[in-house]
Amino acid sequence: IVLRLASADCPDAFSRPDYVIPLTSWYYGKQKWPFRFDAETPPFFMRHATNDSGYGFALSVKEKLLEAGVPLDWKTVDDGGHGAFEITVDGYGHDWTVELVEWMRKNKILKTDNHEKEVD
């Protein structure tokens, strides 16, 4: 549903998200590519494990986003499957959250540091 709302086929501009953060993907289940991305598609922060069964679909999404000129921050990991980005997982399962905050600041999605406390 997120890809549908982010696509050019979104029923109205108010339903379209400002950004998209898919951490794993899955095959949509249709033979024909169901999404159209364009200049109005919001930026994507994508992470995927190469050993996830949905990796091929994620590569298709990546290719279509790049063809449409959509801003994309893409990284993969080799292990972890569909649960590679659970924050309870050691390693990159924790690290991607720092990258996400930096990406959100860079894209002016996260505008303040109010969540950080000053230390004396």
Feature annotation, model-predicted:
Residues 19, 42-43, 71:
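Proline-centered loop/turn at the N-terminus of a beta-strand
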Residues 24, 48-49:
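The conserved beta1-alpha1 loop
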Residues 1-39:
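Primarily recognizes the serine-hydrolase "nucleophile elbow" in alpha/beta-hydrolase
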Residues 18-19, 55-63:
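Short, mixed-charge, low-aromatic patches
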Residues 9-16, 49-52, 89-91:
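Short, charged helix-to-loop "capping" segments that act as catalytic/coupling loops
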Residues 28-29, 50-56:
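Acidic catalytic loop of the alpha/beta-hydrolase fold
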Residues 40, 45-48:
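Short beta-strand/loop motif that positions the catalytic acidic residue
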Residues 47, 59-120:
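C-terminal catalytic histidine-bearing segment of alpha/beta-hydrolase fold enzymes
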